[in-house]
């Protein structure tokens, strides 16, 4: 071997000589050998004289020993694949001849996570003769299959395959499966099952576990004990006990209370087999004493012991008058000995628990603070639910709607529930201000002008708007739905369904006037005569008679329309109200103090 020369050292002198073995051959290396390994050959003495270079004699022996060990490992691995592990024992005394390793198996499928090779076939050659003293291991017909899946953390083998006889090779090869890009002959289409074998449900395979598919399923041992027949339970008829009260389960999220009559009906409807099973009842142990509960669950009977003396002593030591089991209370019966009867205390206890939970819920709800005003209290000034303690909304007397009768000056109620406090939050917009004619300095109405297309403020309609003048909606007593849609669909709208006023009702009830108005002929004549009187005189001292006639004529004119109205009322003909004709009026109006002058 040449000495190693580093880059830091100086170059060797040119006087050194290098000798190369002329028998060195590269063709002897195979794919499975390492580059430093030399194929084993029988050591022969060189024909030529020994070179001047000295070679360590142990070097070749060490190389030969390494090669022998490698060949031995290859043979052992091959035998492990061919011979079953149960019949093979590794014997260090066996010395096999050095034979070249077989070529690697042909790759069938190669994927990024899976590598599949064709099963290796041992070539039939001359049998290896071993020493007579060395026992030959028996070779089984079962051949361990090669690895079919190699992943990062998991190795899976196929099931054990029996060596097929030589006659099987005469069968034609399985049909090939041709795809678009390749031809696969290793898959047998005739033997592949149509239905995949399902994994058992209770089998658990970890993420990094090794699972063998060739293991036979263990046979379950049949128990010699007689198996009791389990009766099917109808889930729709299942019962639930809540605080000792039985409930029947109707659906998944709904139960109903089961009465005593219905429970007896259910007991009668049971099958005879179930009745025979439940006639004996259940056995309970309470404080060391044995009791039997009847099927109805209403009677608890104590089972007496064999010796009567022991029974009496135990009864005297511990006298049970009351037993509480599962929320139910049993009291000793005064008529029979060792019999306890169920009471209805569990029902009252359930009612008490329910009432307690309800009271706690109400108390917790009363502590909840809300700022939503009560619409009923704002509109009427009174809330019955609030007086009962059920309404949790805000009840503020400052937000009660203002009394409309108070604004007109007509409210005479001493205990009016509506507000008599005039504030801008409750007052509508001043109509005179909208026309521009409001001259009051302390006008209680709201002074702001908005477009007629603006929406009606709903808070103001309810009785109180906290924004007042800063609100961008109209404050008017009108229906918001009618202003928005043009029609109101509310059945009891205060603004749309107003009753007709009293004034319009009176107008409709009044009768019509006659078709021909009464002509005042007398008054017309008298007026003509009055016009003919001289106008030069300012006072009527010289003309007393015409003045008296004028006064009497005015009285007649006032009486005639009243008489006509009475006649028309008696006739009962309805007519709109009309103003009576005045006729010709006098030029001068006489005064009462003119006669004295």
Curated annotation (Swiss-Prot):
Biological process, per Gene Ontology: mRNA processing; mRNA transport; nuclear export; regulation of mRNA export from nucleus
Alphabetical UniProt keywords: Metal-binding, mRNA processing, mRNA transport, Nucleus, Repeat, RNA-binding, Transport, Zinc, Zinc-finger
Start and end residues of each stretch annotated as Disordered: 515-597
Any one GO molecular-function label of the UniProt entry: RNA binding
Primary subcellular site in the record, as a coarse category: nucleus
A GO term from the CC aspect: nucleus
Bias (Basic and acidic residues): 542-562
InterPro entries, A to Z: Znf_CCCH (IPR000571)
Family matches, as Gene3D superfamilies: Zinc finger, CCCH-type
Location in or out of the cell: Nucleus
Start and end residues, zinc fingers (C3H1-type): 397-423, 424-450, 451-478
SMART domains in UniProt: ZnF_C3H1
PROSITE patterns tied to this protein: ZF_C3H1
Domain of life: Eukaryota
Domain notes per entry: The C-terminal region is required for nuclear mRNA export.
Role, per record: Required for the export of polyadenylated mRNAs from the nucleu; binds to polyadenylated mRNA, and is involved in the regulation of mRNA polyadenylation.
Assembly information from the UniProt record: Interacts with Pabp2, sbr and swm.
Protein name, entry field: Zinc finger CCCH domain-containing protein 3
Organism: Drosophila melanogaster
């Amino acid at each position: 071997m040449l000495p190693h020369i580093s880059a830091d050292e100086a170059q060797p002198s040119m006087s050194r000589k290098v000798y190369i073995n002329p028998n060195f051959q590269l063709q002897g290396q195979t794919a499975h050998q390492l580059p430093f390994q030399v194929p084993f050959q029988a050591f022969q003495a060189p024909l030529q004289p020994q070179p001047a270079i000295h070679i360590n004699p142990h070097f070749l022996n060490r190389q030969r020993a390494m090669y022998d060990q490698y060949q031995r490992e290859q043979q052992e691995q091959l035998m492990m694949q061919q011979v079953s592990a149960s019949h093979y024992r590794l014997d260090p005394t066996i010395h096999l001849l050095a034979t070249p390793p077989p070529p690697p198996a042909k790759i069938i499928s190669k994927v990024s996570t899976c590598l599949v090779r064709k099963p290796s076939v041992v070539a039939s050659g001359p049998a290896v003769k071993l020493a007579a003293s060395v026992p030959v291991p028996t070779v089984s017909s079962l051949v361990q299959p090669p690895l079919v899946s190699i992943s990062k953390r998991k190795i899976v083998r196929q099931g054990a395959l029996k060596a097929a006889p030589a006659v099987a090779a005469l069968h034609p090869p399985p049909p090939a499966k041709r795809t678009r890009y390749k031809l696969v002959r290793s898959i047998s289409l005739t033997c592949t099952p149509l239905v995949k074998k399902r994994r058992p449900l209770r089998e658990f395979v970890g993420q990094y576990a090794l699972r063998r598919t060739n293991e036979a399923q263990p046979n379950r041992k049949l128990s010699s004990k007689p198996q009791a027949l389990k009766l099917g339970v109808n889930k729709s008829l299942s019962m639930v006990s809540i605080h000792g009260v039985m409930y029947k389960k109707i659906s998944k999220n709904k139960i109903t209370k089961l009465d005593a009559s219905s429970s007896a009906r259910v007991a009668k409807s049971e099958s005879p087999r179930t009745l025979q099973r439940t006639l004996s009842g259940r056995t309970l142990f309470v404080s060391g004493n044995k009791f039997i509960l009847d099927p109805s669950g209403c009677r608890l009977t104590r089972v007496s012991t064999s010796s009567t003396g022991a029974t009496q002593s135990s009864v005297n030591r511990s006298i049970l008058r009351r037993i509480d089991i599962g929320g139910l209370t049993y009291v000793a019966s005064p008529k029979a000995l060792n019999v306890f009867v169920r009471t209805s205390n569990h029902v009252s206890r359930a009612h008490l628990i329910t009432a307690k939970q309800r009271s706690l819920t109400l108390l917790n709800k009363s502590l909840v603070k809300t700022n939503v005003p009560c619409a009923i209290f704002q509109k009427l000034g009174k809330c019955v639910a609030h007086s009962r303690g059920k309404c949790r909304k805000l009840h503020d007397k400052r937000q009660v709607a203002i009394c409309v009768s108070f604004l007109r000056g007509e409210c005479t109620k001493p205990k009016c529930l509506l507000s008599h406090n005039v504030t801008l939050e409750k007052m509508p917009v001043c109509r005179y201000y909208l026309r521009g004619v409001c001259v009051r300095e302390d006008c209680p109405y709201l002074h702001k002008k908005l477009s007629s297309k603006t929406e009606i403020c709903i808070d103001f309609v309810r009785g109180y708007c906290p924004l007042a003048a800063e609100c961008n909606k109209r404050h008017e007593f009108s229906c918001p739905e009618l202003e928005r849609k043009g029609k109101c669909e509310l059945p009891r709208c205060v603004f749309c369904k107003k009753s007709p006023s009293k004034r319009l009702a009176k107008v409709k009830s009044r009768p019509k006037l006659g078709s021909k108005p009464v002509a005042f002929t007398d008054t017309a004549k008298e007026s003509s005569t009055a016009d003919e009187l001289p106008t030069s005189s300012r006072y009527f001292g010289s003309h007393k008679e015409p003045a008296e006639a004028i006064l009497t004529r005015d009285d007649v004119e006032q009486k005639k329309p009243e008489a006509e109205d009475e006649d028309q009322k008696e006739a009962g003909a309805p007519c709109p109200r009309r103003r009576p004709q005045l006729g010709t009026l006098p030029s001068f109006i006489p005064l009462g103090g003119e006669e004295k002058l």
